[in-house]
Amino acid sequence: MGGRDQITNLGSEGETHPWGYSSPPYPLHTFFIPFLPSGFGGSGLGIPSDNEKHDLQDCVEVSRPEGPAPELPSSLCGWNKISSLCGLGFPSRDPKTWDLAMLLSPWVDFFELQLL
């Protein structure tokens, strides 16, 4: 399943993950992103300044159906220039978090996203 310090792609159809999440019943990529306090950049997105390790329980699951990448909203158009991030902060369990992360996933290299 990969090391504790590495976000791991665990996407397989209908899989229930150790953290209690269930993947939707369609082909997808599933990622676990560190949940960090909102307030970075005022939008809940940002790169944290601390080097603390966070447990995998502090992650949110991100799933996106396979296929063409959706178009980024204009307010996020700058994000497509970022190949990897060391942290993303989302409101945990907020459905809008999933929407945003699904939009970002084609442009952000979540495989390089580290738990901080």
From Swiss-Prot:
Seems to be expressed only in testis. This is Putative BPES syndrome breakpoint region protein. It comes from Homo sapiens.
